Every structure is written in structure tokens, then in C-alpha cells.
Amino acid sequence: MWLYYLLKTMSTVISWLPYKAVVVIGKGMGHLYHKIAKKQRVRAEETIRERLGYSQEQAEATIKSLFVKLGITFMEIMYMPALNKDNIRSLVTFDRPEVLWDALKEKHGVVMLACHMDNWEWLGAALALNGFPLSAVEKPQPNRVYSDFMNELRKGVGQEIFSRGTSEILGCARAMKKGRMLGLIADQDGGYDGIFVPFLGKMASTPNGPAYFSRKFKAPIVPIFIVRKPDGYGHKAIVRDPIHYEFTGDQKLDDYNVTLKMTQEVEKIIKEYPDNWLWFQHRWNTPYTPQEEEKQPDEK
């Protein structure tokens, strides 16, 4: 339990700081992280060169900016107990919140599509504190104590949390039936159960959860991404147009098409804000084989 109390104490102390101090300290931590995390840094630089065609100089500059942002993000996560309905509006601004409200009015629930951009934890916090009925699925970390601490922070700002490996499917279904927003991170490797679609020029196994819940409940998928403001202080939440599941009678094709559309939205935001995405994650971990190619439906 020592780790829990350490994290709790750190979070309490950091929450007392002015937000500007949180950002300044975070920048320093990010610079340090960039120097010591050689494995992640090299992997990120290699990936961005391969996927976006960057030169070594461009890759190094972009990934350094990413690491600095990650340092700020760590501090901001510890700062989450200080967030409330009053200050969140100045820290995270939404460009088109009406799109989210209109999607909720369809009364089928909403699949909120997010990715590992910037501080995705604050995206969930901002949605919940702005009154959106948000439920989300979290992937348990190897350290159970850390996962419990993070879930405590998430619930503290009003999110309903389901953990993978429990009865999360049932919980998600109930949330959708209640007309809530279901937050799903869909830029991770989907394993052998995922749907292979092109992603940044390479076939990638993509989680099938958004397609499943959109199909099951006839719910719109609303891509929403958070990016850090240029000066490092605060964030902007970018809301894209809803994606609706199209029923043709061929479920496999329909799942593929909606997954392709949402993946293309993730691609667009990454290319627009490349130093906000987590380039060192193992996104293409599941190999794409000729057998998988035969399984993919023809694109229309």
C-alpha cells in the first residue's frame, strides 16, 4: 500500500500548486524523461520516420516536444483532484460541444472515440465536469495499486469506470441503454480479435469495440480528441462529425467500413498534431498475415 499513499500524497501536494507551476515543473520533468527514456525515445523516432516520412532532425524535434508534453501530462494527472466545474472551462475548451449534445439527443447512447493524444485523462474529466454522462473502459495497468489510484481520480471527477477483464461488456451495454456516452480508446493494437485496417500506411489490428456498440445500439460514433495549446497551458477538445453505422446486411463489411472511417479520423488528428500522439506505443504489434488479408472485405 506504500505506493498508493505515495501517489496520494504527491497528488494532494501538487493539487495545492498554481496551475502555471504545475506546467513549469512538468516541462522540466519532460526534458528529464526525454534524456533518460532512451528505449521509448528511439522507438518513437523510428516510428514517426517510418509512418510520416520525417527526417531524423524532424523526428528528434517532434519526439522531444512529445516528451515535454508527457511530463506536463503526468503533473496534470496528479493535479486532477483540483479540477472542478468552474476551473475546467478555462483549462479545456471544446470547439463544438453542440455536436455531442445533439448526438445524445438521438437517445441511442453515444460511442465517444478517443485516442492517446495529449492528456486523454483530462478529456474524460472535462466531459464529465461539463455535464456529459460519461462511462469509460480502462485497461488495468500491470501494477494494480496504480490502476486503483487512477480509477479513484477518474471517479472523483464524475466518470463511471469499467475495467477490462471484469464484466465490462455488461456494464457498457447498460450505460448505452441509459443513453450515456461510452468512452473508448481505439488507437491501441487490437490483437487477433481486432479488425485490420490501414493506419498511417500500414495495416493495423484495431479494437472492434466501437463498431460493436455502434451496431448493437444504433449509436453514433463521435470522434473527440484533446490537444495541448501551443504555449503548453491548457487544452483544446476537438469534436469531429458523428460517424453512423451503415447496415448493408454484411456485418463483417459494415464493421470494417465503420472501423476504417474512425481510424481515418485518428490519422487526420495525428498528422495535424504529431507531437501530441504517443508514438512509442506498440500500435502495430499484431502481425498482418496473408490469411488476414483474405479475411478482409473489399472496400467500397
What kind of region is each of these model predictions?
Residues 1-114, 156-158:
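Membrane-anchoring hydrophobic helices of lipid-metabolizing enzymes
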Residues 5, 40, 92, 164, ...:
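Soluble or luminal CAZymes and related metallo-dependent hydrolases
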Residues 9, 21, 44, 123, ...:
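Hydrophobic alpha-helical segments typical of transmembrane helices
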Residues 33, 54-59, 64, 102-104, ...:
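Non-catalytic C-terminal accessory region of glycerolipid acyltransferases
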Residues 39, 94, 118, 144-145, ...:
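Residue-level recognition of alpha-helix initiation/capping sites
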Residues 87-92, 139, 158-164, 200-201, ...:
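Short, flexible loop segments at the rims of nucleotide/cofactor-binding pockets, characterized by
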Residues 106-166, 172, 189-195, 232:
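Catalytic core of membrane glycerolipid acyltransferases/transacylases, capturing the structured
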